[in-house]
């Protein structure tokens, strides 16, 4: 299954300011392709999910919370926000 990932400008800015790189982003995207309903649905948001994602080789302190929306019918994921 091919998915398109769309990042908000604030997601991209914060992603790199947290020290993550393009390889980490590819790892996150692959995880979401394999697990499109991962994370907890945030009540009252219409589908926004919050996911704790630990990156390989970075340990527990290298994890982040990612807020995203999956539109399965359109094969699109919107990466909304990231924080640690």
Task: Indicate residue ranges for each PLM-predicted region.
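Enriched for short, Lys/Arg-rich terminal
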Residues: 69-84
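Arg/Lys-rich, positively charged N-terminal/basic patches that mediate binding to nucleic acids
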Residues: 1-24
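Anionic group-transfer/hydrolysis microenvironments
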Residues: 9, 52, 83
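Short, surface-exposed coil-to-beta transition loops
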Residues: 61-66
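A short, surface-exposed loop/turn module that caps and links secondary-structure elements
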Residues: 31-58
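Conserved catalytic network of the ASCE P-loop NTPase/AAA+ motor domain
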Residues: 58-60, 72
